Amino acid sequence: MKNTLTALLTALAVSTTALAQTTTDTTRPLLIVTSFLPIQSHTLAIAGQNAEVVQLLGKDAGPHDFQLSPSDVKKLAEADLFIINGAGIEDWLDDLVKKSSNKDLVIVDSSKGVDLVESPEEVAIAGGHGHHHHQGDGGNPHIWLDPVIAQKQAANIVAALQKAEPANAAAYAENGAAYAAELEALDAEYRATLAPLPNKNLVSFHDAFPYLSARYGLNYVGAIAEFPEKDPTPRQLASLVDKIRELQVGVLFAETGYAPGLLEKIAKETGAKVSSLDTLEVGQGGAKAYLERMRKNLSSLQRAFGRDE
């Protein structure tokens, strides 16, 4: 993966003449709007000082519960690019584009080329069925929580910025290569830290971690709620408690930004501990935000799985 990404980004740096030309206003920096935190962080790292990068979602909003406002539409009025995670999580995208007066806006889907997974039958144990995010896409959209997939998303962003502004193509490729190396280092840290740990049963607040679990050998038992803002019914809750007891799950992961009351109630009934994982859906930050918050998640996993269940 490392050699492939390095070769790809190096090739992008020297092949600017092959890029399609676009008509951006050269009197101002490229103006980029991103959907939410992971995409904002990737784009800031790649753009550097060569573009203005603005996040659409405010610091307290997440993509699941985002409510479109006139000020959000206004943010896109002058933008050259709108970079999204894709995979269906921005299900308000069509409405946003429809209301925007910016007919020259280029939408960049950073999930291009990523294979989506269906949540397995046992994952949405609160509902007793597979959790289908945004059924038009037919897959789980939380791809950014896998650092290897994040490398693919970053490469897609590099290519989009080079196409939009060929004059800075080499700078975008150089920044992209440096960022790819940081993502590769993050992946290596996850592998080295998690591989030797026992008891890697993961029950999360909502169904955000199938990609991370598959990448690093975690047993993704299930999710508490179908969406972060939707609690299970009493019948679903009883089924969930039975499942946790049956599998002897020792740790339940609350979600940063949401009250852990429901998980604490389940933990009291089952004897499990409560820890916390960050989906990175809520908040704002700089070019290092993705790396920093993913490392905090790694520390949480290390502490939780290091316990004897």
What is each model feature region?
Residues 20-309:
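Extracytoplasmic metal-acquisition and chelation regions
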